[in-house]
Amino acid sequence: MTGKKLKEGFTTGACSAAAAKAATRLLLKGKPILEIETTLPNKRQVLFTVKRCQLEGEVATCSVVKDAGDDPDCTHGAELTARVRLTKENEIKLKGGDGVAVVTKAGLGLEIGQSAINPIPRKNIKEMILEELQGSSFNGAEVEISVPGGQEMAKKTMNERLGLIGGISILGTTGIVKPYSTAAFKASVIQAIQMAKEYGIDTIVLTTGGKSEKFAMDLLPNLNELSFIQVGDFIGTGIKTSVKESIRHTIIVGMIGKLSKMADGVMMTHRGGSSVNTTMLSTIARSIGVPEEIAIEIQNANTARHVLEICKVSGYKIITTKICEIVAEKCSKHAGTNIMISCYMVDFDGKLLGKCENFSPNVGLNL
């Protein structure tokens, strides 16, 4: 790939953790903090510039401005602010303040009424504070994360539709924002598949991100590392390039949100560009014998993850396999030629939920 190298950015979660760590250090040292080094969820060390640094008695407030890199979204430039007070208790109490959404609907992996600070950023924030507290006389802290202007930013997101009210969400599984939605990233997907072919690899694994790639590697440990390719939202590009490069077997590994979009025939899965079709998912549910009242509940679900929760509770987990079958069939049609496709669905911990193996238009399904 030629041209400018893409610049990565940082998630709202990573910036919040940096701000919280800086505020904790300010309380312990009593000196202005200009920069703070933190460890991201992916274990990478990063140095952040601290914008706001304010000490008022027992409370410190620090902020870090989000740089989304070469894939800026509506939170690019957001000032992630942490207000911290240290305590003697063995607990870090974390809540969202102004500009951080509150959860009002199920299906998001967070309790209703809780601030929309996702589990991995929540863990990272606490870890960074505890790192600073080592060797001090304090054991815990009360932390509030806020985002000035967060309510306005949220209007440009799907938060309100998802039941996230009053601001943005604090997100990020790795701490890094990869520029998936750029033309240059699309080019890198093509290049990665071409490279795999050059090395004699005839089975590739297309994943939607770093987390699903790690899970895919755990599921398929015998494959060459070059077989695993992060396609981001460009699943369609990955399929078409596999055909062009005469790849024998293409495996897709993802979680229910992205796979549900693929089952709906969407081959460019950016969350801002398409939403999950719960009507389609309810139709799939009916096809496997789900009672009508549950099918209606699925149709009214908040997210694809919510659909999964409904199916688990009602005992119809087989829907995950059915989704994988449809994904394999839709991707095969998108390929436009005879190509063998498999699809694996994993949960957020990497557990295999469903699969369709070796689908081909000529042989059908081999489950």
Curated annotation (Swiss-Prot):
Reaction(s) the record says it catalyses: Co-precorrin-5B + S-adenosyl-L-methionine = Co-precorrin-6A + S-adenosyl-L-homocysteine
Organism of derivation: Leptospira interrogans serogroup Icterohaemorrhagiae serovar copenhageni (strain Fiocruz L1-130)
EC id: 2.1.1.195
Gene Ontology biological-process entries: anaerobic cobalamin biosynthetic process; methylation
Name by which UniProt lists this protein: Cobalt-precorrin-5B C(1)-methyltransferase
One Pfam match: CbiD
Acetylation listed as a keyword: no
Enzyme class: transferase
Keyword match Nucleotide-binding: no
InterPro entries: CbiD, CbiD_sf
Molecular function in Gene Ontology: cobalt-precorrin-5B C1-methyltransferase activity
Stated family: Belongs to the CbiD family.
Cross-referenced NCBIfam families: cbiD, PRK00075.1-1
Pathway: Cofactor biosynthesis; adenosylcobalamin biosynthesis; cob(II)yrinate a,c-diamide from sirohydrochlorin (anaerobic route): step 6/10
Key words of the record: Cobalamin biosynthesis, Methyltransferase, S-adenosyl-L-methionine, Transferase
